[in-house]
Amino acid sequence: MKTKPFSQAALSLAIALALSACAAPKANPNLTLEATGQVMSTAETAERYDVNGNWWEIYQSPQLNALMEQALANNVDLKQAAISVNKALYQANILGADLVPSFSGSLGANASKNLKTGSHGNTFSSQLGLSYELDLWRKLSATADAQVWEYQATHEDMANTRLTLINNVADAYFNIAYLNEAIELAQKSLKQYQEINRIANAKFRYGRADSSQPTQAKQSLLSAENSLLSLQNNLDTQKQVLRNLLNLRPSENMAADPAQFRLLPVKGVNLDVPITVLANRPDLRAAEYRLQASQQSVNAQKRSWYPSITLGASLSTSSDKAKSTFNIPMLGGSATINLPFLNWQTMKWKD
């Protein structure tokens, strides 16, 4: 770096700051797709319809509410999705920092001694620097915007994970509730078949029926027993599915006793909803955001071939005495032009 007179260095610094204000628009964290007017936005959907994210609460079931609360607190997939959101936000903040000037500073002290003459000397120095890459082609902005889109996509991923978890827990609850009632009916039916089998055998013993009646009664009884056994096996499977969704250890209990699950009254569903609201599904929105992120990444990669200009300024001092280190500052400025297209053999493999 060459040392320049104070006025020239100050002028370079002023130009750098002025260009930074013009050439570095911030990445917009509120980028949306509703500007096209082709889909109904989330805000419009919420305004026109009664959108309740905790829809299961309309059933007013303490067991179902307790299960949902436990699932949302314990589920591993939901926690991993939250971590992904934080990582994407962290990366977006890092890339956004490239749009503003970066500062650096240092303090140094050096001591030396001549072993032959015994003389020694001390040197003290300090430096304050500023560096800024002009975003002339909006390469940095495109890179930052791509990460903002990715951050929004991870938000939708978490919303989709939450929605999937809620639906799976609700399915497991209603499956268990159905199986509980089906098993109760199957047990009552089994008792009836047992009584029919007893009567058929008694008739056969007293000669009031041929051998086919006890045989048919036994077959019906075995069929009822098999049906009951199948329902019980399905119930055990659904209970294990629910435990997995709740992320429970073998020693932990569910927030509600599955034996108490019962089918709930059917609630009315508003069917007068336009199909355009499907565009607000979290998985679809995540896919749309990632398409936008890919487009911005392509733009940034194309613009990486263009020349880049980096401006720098520094304020440095040096003295052989600590108390006079800051007495005689020297101001310097620099401008660096990078020509990446000259390294085309490497750049072409990155596209």
Identify the function of each model-found stretch:
Residues K79-A97, S106-N110, Q292:
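Short, acidic/charged, Gly/Pro-enriched secondary-structure junctions
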Residues K2-I15, L19-A73, Q232-A279:
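Terminal intrinsically disordered/low-complexity segments used for targeting and assembly
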Residues Q80, G96, L134-R162, S212, ...:
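Sec/SRP-type N-terminal targeting helices
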Residues S104-E133, K139, T143-W149, T154-D157:
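Outer membrane beta-barrel translocator domains of Type V secretion systems
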